[in-house]
Amino acid sequence: MSVKIRLKRMGSKKRPFYRIVVADSRSPRDGRFITSLGTYNPLTTPKQVKFDEDAVMEWLQKGAQPSDTVRNMLQKAGVMKKYHEAKYAKK
């Protein structure tokens, strides 16, 4: 089972709101997911992104692959840098 960290669209027509979720890569965009990690609201200025950093790190270490959009959000928040430092740290 390939697991992805991606966005699930919520909200109403023309008023999108997204949840950052962990889901099986074969499930549909707005379908079943394993767990919710945070939210993303593109309508606010500045765009509002909230997520549980510890849970995201845990899923990345388990092998979950972030989508391109989620990867960019995590890079801006500094999570991807922490993940790579932890992954390639000298032991």
Swiss-Prot record:
GO terms for biological process: translation. Pfam families: Ribosomal_S16. Keywords: Ribonucleoprotein, Ribosomal protein. GO terms for molecular function: structural constituent of ribosome. SUPFAM superfamilies: Ribosomal protein S16. InterPro entries: Ribosomal_bS16 (IPR000307), Ribosomal_bS16_dom_sf (IPR023803). It comes from the Bacteria. GO terms for cellular component: cytoplasm; small ribosomal subunit. PANTHER family: 30S RIBOSOMAL PROTEIN S16, SMALL RIBOSOMAL SUBUNIT PROTEIN BS16M. Belongs to the bacterial ribosomal protein bS16 family. This is Small ribosomal subunit protein bS16. It comes from Limosilactobacillus fermentum (strain NBRC 3956 / LMG 18251). The gene is rpsP.
